[in-house]
């Protein structure tokens, strides 16, 4: 039975927020002071968290997929994805320049990954340009999640898939505190409002970690 799965990254985030006197229940990633030192330390300690593997290995990636990772951070997830999606194209978008710089240094060479400084609310890609989108522990940090969901819908091709992955905490919620996206049901309701269909939820676990993985589809 699952008792408690807690990402180490959440503990580190709490430490940063306490030092900066920021309310973690009302925070976007841009509000954290991501100094080079903080970002480098985060990359070393938490960049390869198992949630990346659990997500990438359960979204049915194909060699020729065109994948977008929103809030890619240090690029750990897309680096894993590139070894499966080796004939396609992968985009990693993050609003933190230091994270993008670390991701660029860490990617395999040669690589089919393109890292872009940007946000969920203004994805720097064309309409209907990707067929899979992932957001791993990032949707709760979007400044305007409703606008972000509309942007995901815009860049997805017809029948494209969107996956939202969050760490399992206390068996029931997403571990990000009170807010409009506190539970999986909240997230799934917002996806439905945005026009996504075939919305499902599946949990995946490995050792002492696990994820909630929500999948949905753009109809056309």
Spell out what each predicted region is:
Residues 9-60, 76-80, 99, 106, 163-186, ...:
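Conserved class I S-adenosyl-L-methionine
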Residues 66, 160-161:
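Short glycine-centered segments of the SAM/dcSAM-binding site in methyltransferase folds
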Residues 68-70, 74-122:
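Class I SAM-dependent methyltransferase SAM/SAH-binding core
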Residues 132-144:
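A short SAM/SAH-binding and catalytic strip from SAM-dependent methyltransferases
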Residues 203-220:
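Core SAM-dependent methyltransferase catalytic element
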């Amino acid at each position: 039975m699952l008792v408690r799965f807690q990402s180490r990254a959440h503990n580190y985030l709490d430490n940063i927020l306490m030092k900066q006197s920021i309310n973690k229940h009302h925070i976007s990633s841009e509000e954290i002071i991501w100094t080079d030192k903080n970002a480098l330390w985060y990359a070393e300690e938490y960049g390869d968290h198992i949630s990346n593997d659990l997500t990438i290995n359960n979204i049915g990636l194909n060699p020729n997929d065109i994948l977008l990772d929103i809030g890619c951070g240090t690029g750990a997830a897309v680096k894993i994805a590139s070894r499966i999606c080796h004939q396609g194209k992968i985009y990693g978008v993050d609003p933190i320049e230091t994270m993008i710089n670390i991701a660029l240094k860490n990617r395999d060479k040669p690589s089919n990954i393109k890292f872009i400084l940007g946000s969920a609310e203004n994805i720097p890609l064309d309409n209907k340009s990707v067929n899979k989108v992932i957001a791993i522990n990032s949707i709760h940090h979007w400044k305007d999640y409703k606008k972000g969901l509309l942007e995901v819908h815009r860049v997805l091709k017809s029948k494209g898939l969107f996956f939202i992955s969050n760490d399992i905490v206390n068996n029931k919620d997403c571990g990000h505190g009170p807010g409009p996206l506190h539970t999986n049901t909240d997230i799934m309701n917002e996806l439905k409002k945005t026009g996504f269909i075939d919305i499902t939820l599946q949990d995946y676990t490995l050792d002492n970690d696990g994820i909630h993985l929500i999948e949905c589809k753009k109809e056309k």
